[in-house]
Amino acid sequence: MSWLTKLLPPKIKREQGPQRRGNLPEGLWSKCPSCEAVLYATDLENNLQVCPKCGHHNRLNSRQRLDLLLDSEGRFEIGAEVLPVDSLKFKDSKKYPDRLMEANESTGESDSLVVLQGAIKTMPVVAAAFEFDFMGGSMGSVLGERFVRGVQAAVEQKMPFICITASGGARMQEGLFSLMQMAKTTAALTKLSAAGLPFISILTDPTMGGVSASFAFVGDVVIAEPKALIGFAGPRVIEQTVRETLPEGFQRSEFLLEKGAIDMIVDRRELRDQVARVLALLQKLPAAA
C-alpha cells in the first residue's frame, strides 16, 4: 500500500472520486481537429462551429445549414414524402435497407438531401442542403428527385435556387440509378436558367465525386467555405494513379479559387449576408439590409 493510499481512505475515494467526475457533463469541451485547441462546446456552437483560434470550419448537418441561411419564418419542406427503396436488392457487408435504417436513426433524416422553400432577408428562395452524415451525403434516386422538385418549385414560384453540397459522390447501392441523377439534376437546372432565375452553389467540406462532376460547379455564382475539400477523386487516389506528390492544398477551396474554378470563399459567419448581397445583385433588387 502506497503512502497516498494511506492518506486517502478507501471510503473517501469511493464517495468523492466518482462524484467529482459525475459533475462534469459529457461533451462540455471539444478539440479542434486543425489547431488542436481545446474549446468550450458552447462557445464553439455560438461561433457556428468555427474554431475561434484558427478559423477551422467544422461540419454542420443539413438543418443547421438551412437554419443559418434562411429566415426563421415562412418555411416549408419540399419532397419529404419521397423515400428510398431497394430496387436492386443490393447487399455488400450489409443490406441496403439496413444501412438506410441506421442512417435514419443516427441523423433523423430519411435521405441525404433536405429542401426548404423560404426566404433570405425577405427575398424568397428555394434552398437545398446535403446531409453528409446520411451515408456520406451520397447521391441516390431520392436526392435527385427532391433536388428536381426543389428546382421545379423555384421555377413555378419564380425564385432563385440555392444548394449547399457536402457529399462523397454517387450512392453505390443504387448503381446506375444513382449515376442517372447526375444528368437529371443538371438537366433540371437548365430550366431554371431558361427562366432567368439564379442558381447559387455553396460548396462545403467535402464535395466530391458525382456531385462535383454534375451540378456543383454550374451555379451562376459558386461559393465555397474556407479549406473545403472539393474535387472528383480524393488526393490519395490521384497520387497513387499519377505517382506524383500533389501540391500543398490541392483540391482545397483556396487552390480552386486561385485557378478560377470558384467565384469566392466566404466565412460561414458571413455567409448569410454575402448570399443576400449576391441575390440582390443577380435579381437587380435593392441591397439587403
From Swiss-Prot:
Cofactor note (record): Binds 1 zinc ion per subunit.
Keyword Cell inner membrane tagged: no
Predominant localisation class: cytoplasm
SUPFAM superfamilies registered for this protein in UniProt: ClpP/crotonase
Pathway in which this enzyme or protein is active: Lipid metabolism; malonyl-CoA biosynthesis; malonyl-CoA from acetyl-CoA: step 1/1
Enzyme Commission number(s) from the entry: 2.1.3.15
Residues in coiled coil: none
GO cellular component terms attached to this protein's record: acetate CoA-transferase complex
Subunit and interaction comment: Acetyl-CoA carboxylase is a heterohexamer composed of biotin carboxyl carrier protein (AccB), biotin carboxylase (AccC) and two subunits each of ACCase subunit alpha (AccA) and ACCase subunit beta (AccD).
Function statement: Component of the acetyl coenzyme A carboxylase (ACC) complex. Biotin carboxylase (BC) catalyzes the carboxylation of biotin on its carrier protein (BCCP) and then the CO(2) group is transferred by the transcarboxylase to acetyl-CoA to form malonyl-CoA.
Name this polypeptide is given: Acetyl-coenzyme A carboxylase carboxyl transferase subunit beta
Organism: Dechloromonas aromatica (strain RCB)
